[in-house]
């Protein structure tokens, strides 16, 4: 087990680059170390922060508790069956690196999720998604450390209660399960999912008439994301800041009468998902700045750390965006990242 550090600077551990310190900090290199970590005097399951890539958190002030940085690495193929390859990745693996690894193996299923920041362990929590694919589509099971019993358990896909940007790990399982690895069921034969946005055109341009591959899709997704989204190493951000709101069919129809070009995505239950970025853009908020935080000038869905933003700058800007969108559309926006402490949640 690694030694505990105290008053550790967390700025390098959150992609928005907010300045905060951890009262105590320890790096986890192997899942088995969890048995020792939970017995540390600094450990309190009600206040511990399990930290991955830091791409889905907003640190509003110094963290008054233990931060466990998940650095366990490793990828292994478990089995092949009926055209599927089951691959286990440890929670500390960088998500994009893992996606590229599966693409290089000729496997299909994760290519649409290329270049999403964060770690493998965080992917089921948020049920990350992009370009018509959600990670729940390819997760077979999730291995966790159960803090109630202090044993390792394996949860099936169904056990995880996946929904849009939701899972068991954000609801009743929050504070109980520590994700240590994820098993993915990936296809040996490439089945493209190109029904979202401008992805099909980008893939066609790359493949130039030949049959497209998973690598083509991954490369196209990377190119599109790089053209729209800032690199968090250059300009601090947490990717998409707001969830795409889901409204009733009646509300969507009313809005469509006023805004005929409004993007909308009918859902199986009859509701309609709207594009948060489009709503924000219609309010002419690109480039709007409060303190050091700003709405990105090319992608309205992204808030950025433009000039040493304080936590209060980010909170005020997010609140302003939500209020402005609600005033114009009567649609509520909700933030994707987690506010820490949660009392700051919008």
Predicted feature residues:
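Anion-binding (especially nucleotide phosphate/pyrophosphate-binding) glycine-rich loop
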Residues: 1-142, 146-148
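Phosphate/pyrophosphate- and phosphate-bearing ligand-binding catalytic cores of soluble enzymes
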Residues: 5-6, 11-18, 57, 152-312, ...
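Beta-rich strand-turn-strand
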Residues: 107, 311-314
